[in-house]
């Protein structure tokens, strides 16, 4: 797919070594922790969601597995650069930090912004094996997840989103 979007063109350039790597998730983390990569990644994710009719305002929270904290932060900063408000919460293993929100059994499940009554999108770049668990845990707080975004095309994430009845989006990183 040909594009003239400067963010997507920059992401394609930055992501080329990532896609050739035997461990693309580790390389994705490196990319999102770089100044140029973080700025581009946040805008790409927001733009992808907008292309799927999910603009900030339709959601006010991004939920991410803890391994995707840098991507969640990139989205927050990109939204702020557009004059928009976006918060984030990280899904944690049962033994998360003391500052996390607890579920009914006292297990810590989320860290970051409060979830109650929020509408969220889910980032799916690292541990989406927890997708169903994240969806159920968010639901306990009255949080509705309306979409799923990934910087790396991921068939498992696409399948999860389809089964959950939510939009899935990922950029076309090839030419």
What are these regions (language model features)?
Residues 1-56:
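Active-site-facing substrate-recognition patch
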Residues 47, 51, 77, 81, ...:
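Short, well-ordered alpha-helices that flank and scaffold nucleotide-derived cofactor binding pockets
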Residues 54-56, 111-116, 140-141, 160-162:
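Solvent-exposed alpha-helices and their adjacent loops that cap or buttress functional pockets
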Residues 56-67, 149-150:
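Short glycine-rich phosphate-binding loop at a beta-alpha junction
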């Amino acid at each position: 797919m040909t594009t003239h979007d400067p963010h997507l063109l920059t992401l394609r350039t930055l992501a080329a070594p990532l896609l050739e790597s035997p461990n693309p998730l580790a390389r994705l983390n490196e990319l999102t922790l770089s100044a140029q990569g973080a700025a581009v990644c946040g805008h790409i994710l927001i733009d992808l969601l907008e292309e799927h009719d999910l603009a900030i305002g339709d959601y006010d929270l991004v939920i991410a597995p803890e391994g995707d904290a840098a991507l969640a932060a990139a989205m927050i900063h990109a939204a702020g650069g557009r004059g928009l408000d976006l918060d984030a919460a990280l899904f944690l293993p049962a033994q998360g930090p003391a500052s996390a929100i607890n579920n009914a059994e006292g297990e810590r499940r989320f860290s970051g912004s409060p979830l109650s009554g929020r509408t969220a999108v889910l980032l799916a770049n690292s541990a989406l094996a927890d997708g169903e668990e994240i969806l159920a845990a968010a639901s306990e707080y009255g949080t509705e997840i309306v979409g799923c975004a990934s910087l790396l095309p991921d068939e498992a994430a696409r399948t999860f989103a389809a089964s959950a009845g939510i939009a899935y989006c990922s950029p076309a990183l090839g030419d």
